[in-house]
Amino acid sequence: MSEEDRNVFTSIDKKGGGSKQMDDLNQKCPKRKTSKLKGIPKLEDANDAGTKNSQQCTLILTEGDSAKTLAVSGLSVVGRDKYGVFPFRRKLLNVCDLNVNQIADSAEVNAIIKILGLQYTKKYETEDDFKTLRYGKLLIMANHDSDGSQFKGLLLNFFHRFWPALFKRDFVEDFITPIAKATEGKEEVSFYSLPEYSEWRMNTDNWKSYTIKYYNGLGTLTSKEAKKCFSDMVRHRIRFKYNGADDDKAVNMAFSKKKIEARTDYLMKLMQDKNQRKQQGLAEECLYNKETRFVTLKDFFNYEIVCSWNLHSIPCLVDGLKPGQRKVLFACFKRANKREVKVAQLAGAVAEISAYHHGEQSLMGTIVNLAQDYVGSHNINLLLPIGQFGTRLQGGKDSASARSIFAQLSQVTRTLFPAHDDNVLRFLYEENQRIEPEWYCPIIPMVLVNGAQGTGTGWSTNIPNYNPRELVKNIKRLIAGEPQKALAPWYKNFRGKIIQIDPSRFACYGEVSVLDDNTIEITELPIKQWTQDYKEKVLEGLMESSDKKSPVIVDYKEYHTDTTVKFVVKLSPGKLRELERGQDLHQVFKLQAVINTTCMVLFDAAGWLRTYTSPEAITQEFYDSRQEKYVQRKEYLLGVLQAQSKRLTNQARFILATINNKIVLENKKKTAIVDVLIKMKFDADPVKKWKEDQKLKELRESGEIELDEDDLAAVAVEEGEDISSAAKAVETKLSDYDYLVGLALIKLSEEEKNKLIKESEEKMAEVRVLEKKTWQDLWITDLDNFMSELTSRRLARKLSLRRTATRWYAMICQRRVTWSSMKESISIRTMTVWSVRMSSRS
């Protein structure tokens, strides 16, 4: 253990301000061991806790109330004498860099200390100290997701920070439950990690005969399954084994702010190792398998914390999406019904279509986020919000329940993610099911359009929004071989100013104007400053008077809407002149903020975490990935058109041969007809064959091994393996000629033959046109289509504003409303349109 950790209390004293504060912290600890506790809601205390048998007792600490219900079901098996249960309902603090007051104010941390009987002044290195505890074990029960891993990680960090000696006594344990189960008849096989399940599938020939069930969380298990887990505690209780300095280093590396640089280097090495295993076709390493009885702290943080936190927190450069967002987009593209759907129902569809194995609550939040369009959220929302999806009043937190709002794929989304590209993406496979791609490839870098925020382990990312029109111009410059122009952050409908301070910093200003000697009007706030927060934290604070000084403001009135900001602020007499002499109004009223571009971290196309220095650098790397996809798209489309032309030509030949009685269909077996077709050199269905070839290519590239028997045989032919399987693969399928023999009698005519020949020639003409096009031409066409759709949306918005202005104008003319009430109710943009309209009529 490092010197820093040995002297933990010294460092805490320095942060807290002295031994007095340390004494205050110790006041939160129990004075003596007691068998009965009061005042801790939802605690199911073990009957023997705090008694002479306390060392045999285990406290089950659960992640939330649903997990507590599962644990209580298990108590019917193990009994209540030696087991207690307590649900932890909030996120535990990272105690590495907190001061004493922050730790002392955590009610749930204090509850854990009281339940266990811990004291900050004891190290629990001796048997006498250990016997003062109310429980001899702490058993953590959390979900199999990134939140569950974080919950466990923060708990381990907490105990390691204050009582590292407890790990030497195997005090902390992990209760694991199956993440998946395979059932066939009475046989059940449980899996505690997805890599373990994948390995079983590879080694089990008849795995398809099993029924597979995934457990999205602890709440998914039934009471019967919970009791079964508790009946085999040896299998399900995993010790956190202390392994010396390596474990100390791993914990500090994961949580200490002083280890940021070292943590970054360490995590980079771990990711390199993981990617190398993937490239070599090796199975993914996992923490839990059927042989696991203990894990070291180092292994836990390497496998559970490092990859999951970063993967789910930081988006990919190519599509700007995190895994959950990508699954939502995949499901929206795949759904046959493109009409609006309830968010809760869409979350269920996403879980089914994309093999999502965690709780649907987070999916609903992801869907809501993708549809939000208030100022400071998205420049282009990929989903249409139909209902209350949140506003700038509370930064989206005021969205309605997912059961009562609807979402729909935005029309502009498909112009950003063209359907033709779906054929050249690298899709992932799970349970022999094709799910979302490793990344989509939009026509402009969406990570810059909508920005990104996220905090992982060792990295955090914060990318501002940029103007999609300017990004289109930069892409066209790159296509033309010209240098990019520097970009400044831009947010849709933001009426303030964004001014560059230096290459990596921009000042963001709200809008404030003086109405008279004692009144100002605030009509815009800095980006990410929400209206409700501003009122509570800034304006209400300025209304408070300080020593011998009058308050800055005496009153304010609110006239904002869900989309606009409007505070009319009354200042104390003479305050305006005083402020103007000393400070800028933007500074006094906190109407300025800084936008940094120094923390732009993303996964690149190869899955590596990288730091980017500018939006132009991101655009350049995106450009390289996108260019490759256009080349692949052209190749794919040429293959499709050529196969379709060949198919039409074969059908025309077939009709002609039938008309000329060279092929007789009446009273003949299908096998005999197919034999004749083969002798006459008719092709097996060219389109079907081409699609099968593309499918096999995709499956091989994805590493998916669970193909149909015929597909495996086809692969064997190409790779020279297993001659018996290869022989089966080349055996002609009768169905390959259905496109000929299945033609309706009415189509066996001269007119139909001529029609097919014409269609074939048209396909070949399309081939010739496409062959002449370059990847640059394809890209520019997509960009122009996108800009056309974007312009249509803007015109529709203007039309909506004009209609609103017209309604107000009519109401004023009819004297149903007054000018002053209109000014208080409508947005500045609508008022401007109304003023123009009124001027044109005067």
UniProtKB/Swiss-Prot annotation:
Basic and acidic residues bias (residue ranges): 1-26
PANTHER family: DNA TOPOISOMERASE 2 TOP-2-RELATED, DNA TOPOISOMERASE/GYRASE
Organism for this UniProt entry: Caenorhabditis elegans
The name this protein goes by in its record: DNA topoisomerase-like protein cin-4
Region: Disordered, residue numbers: 1-50
InterPro entries linked to this entry: DNA_Topoisomerase_II (IPR050634), Topo_IIA (IPR001241), Topo_IIA-like_dom_sf (IPR013760), Topo_IIA_A/C_ab (IPR013758), Topo_IIA_A_a_sf (IPR013757), Topo_IIA_B_C (IPR013759), Topo_IIA_dom_A (IPR002205), TopoII_euk (IPR001154)
GO MF terms held by the record: ATP binding; DNA binding; DNA topoisomerase type II (double strand cut, ATP-hydrolyzing) activity
Effect in UniProt of substituting E304G: In mr127; temperature sensitive mutant
Residue ranges annotated for the Topo IIA-type catalytic domain, each copy included: 314-783
Task of the protein: Plays a role in the removal of cohesin from kinetochores on mitotic chromosomes and is required for centromere resolution.
Record family assignment: Belongs to the type II topoisomerase family.
Record keywords: Cell cycle, Cell division, DNA-binding, Mitosis
Effect of gene knockout: RNAi-mediated knockdown leads to impaired removal of the cohesin component scc-1 from kinetochores on mitotic metaphase chromosomes.
Gene field: cin-4
Biological process annotations from GO: cell division; DNA topological change; resolution of meiotic recombination intermediates; sister chromatid segregation
